[in-house]
Amino acid sequence: MSSDKTESHTAPLRVAIAGLGVVGGEVARQLTHRADAMKAPTVRGVEIVAVSARSRDTDRGFDISNIDWYEDAAALATRDDVDVIVEMIGGHDGVALELVKTSLSRGIHVVTANKALLAHNGTELARLAEESGAALMFEAAIAGGIPAVKTLREGLVGNEMTRLAGILNGTCNYILTTME
């Protein structure tokens, strides 16, 4: 992360969310409504400092009046007070790609559920993350949201994995369950 950011583990994690549709809006609602639960002495709090979406006037079920609003989602990555960017815009290019690349290049951690972005640009984004020391988190983009990446990365680190097979997609799982 950039040198002017507070590295304290007691200061709240400052989050900017790009895209307030179904998923991004629910992330923001959960972070907003569960803010008190996340202020426990053993848990670092979370503060939404900025958001961007197509329309400012949409009722999203949470108050955005005290959150900085950006018309241009890519501009979120230029803020010096953001620790994590949550990208929920969608698409593999354009503003989503610009936002994620700029964020990672600046050492800002990125969370995304954007399958297209990762499929088209995953190698480049992973390289940018590694070079800057930023985390590129994409657990929600694969395996129907189950913690498959974390399990493989952390839980099976001592095992020699040569292959993984299965249908790890929420849509396919739903269709197969319905067919039973």
Residue ranges of predicted features:
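N-terminal glycine-/serine-/threonine-rich beta1-alpha1-beta2 phosphate-ribose binding loop
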Residues: S2-R106
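Glycine-rich beta-alpha junction loops
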Residues: S52-D57, I142-G144, I167-N173
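Charged, alpha-helix-enriched surfaces in structured cytosolic catalytic cores
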Residues: V22, A143, P147, N159, ...
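General beta-strand structural signal in soluble alpha/beta enzymes
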Residues: Y70-E71, V86-E87, V111-A113, L136-A140, ...
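Short acidic, glycine/serine/threonine-rich loops at helix termini
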Residues: A28-R29, G61-I64, G122-L125, P147-E154, ...
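Rossmann-fold NAD(P)-binding glycine/threonine-rich loop
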Residues: G91-R106, A113-E154
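Conserved anion/nucleotide-ligand pocket segment
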Residues: E154-E180
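Glycine-enriched alpha-helix->loop->beta-strand junction motifs that scaffold or abut catalytic
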Residues: R106-H109, G170
